[in-house]
Design a protein with these regions (language model features):
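Electropositive, gly/pro-rich neighborhoods at or near active sites that engage anionic ligands
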Residues: 1-90
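Redox- and metal-dependent alpha/beta enzyme cores, enriched for Fe-S-associated oxidoreductases
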Residues: 75-121, 125, 131-133
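Short, aromatic/basic amphipathic alpha-helical patches
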Residues: 109-113, 155-162
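A short, aliphatic-rich alpha-helical micro-motif
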Residues: 137-138
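Glycine-rich, N-terminal phosphate-binding loop of Rossmann-like dinucleotide-binding domains
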Residues: 147
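Short glycine-rich, flexible loops that bind phosphorylated cofactors or substrates
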Residues: 151-153
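Ser/Thr/Gly-rich flexible loops in soluble cytosolic domains mediating phosphotransfer, phosphorylation
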Residues: 163-188
Length: 188
């Protein structure tokens, strides 16, 4: 039993990362995987009132992607004021995401747009330094690098081209929940 009898809120992002890995990778027994997914979601919903806005939106997206029935409606209008306030206070208008896992960048972008509709998000997956990557590194207000899904040459290139007054943050995982986690950690 991977999760145990209960889930603590400090475990949620790690659990979401594992859930995301089971979606990205093949499985020899689809029934066991579906059973695992259902167990994970039911455990997460037990602590729903303690989850952050981005965690709730990630769970909502998982349920939609995996076509789970809405046995219990997740608060779609999760309180996102901390994140919005952070972006407004720092006058953040542009966000860049670098990851070789294109689906993760895209899904993270969709969830961020749901929380902050007016933000401009650009994703990049170049494996080496390019002119578009250089421009993005110089101009984005915040740059998120998914280090588990990045090429060292591109990561170094981004860091070398980032102005000192611009924020660069590093997501430990390769999935979209890791990208959201690192942004959220900056906001609260």
């Amino acid at each position: 039993d991977l999760i145990g009898d209960g889930v603590g809120t400090s475990q949620v992002y790690g659990i979401l990362d594992i859930l995301e890995e089971t979606i990205m990778n093949s499985c020899p027994d689809q029934n066991i995987r579906k059973s695992f997914w259902n167990e994970v979601i039911s455990k997460l919903l037990e602590v729903e009132q303690h989850l952050s806005p981005s965690q709730l939106l990630v769970i909502k997206k998982f349920r939609k992607t995996l076509e789970w029935p809405d046995q219990k409606e997740i608060k779609a209008e999760a309180e996102t004021s901390d994140i919005k306030d952070f972006f407004e206070k720092l006058k953040i208008k542009t966000l860049a995401i670098y990851s070789l896992t294109e689906s993760a960048s895209k899904q993270a972008s969709e969830i961020i747009k749901e929380m902050i509709p007016n933000i401009k998000i650009t994703v990049n997956k170049d494996k080496v330094g390019t002119n578009p990557l250089k421009s993005l590194a110089k101009n984005a207000d915040i740059f998120v690098i998914a280090t588990s899904s990045a090429k060292h040459a591109a990561t170094t290139f981004i860091q070398n081209n980032r102005p000192k007054d611009k924020m660069t943050i590093f997501a430990a995982g390769r999935g979209y929940s890791s990208i959201l986690r690192v942004i959220e950690e900056q906001c609260v």
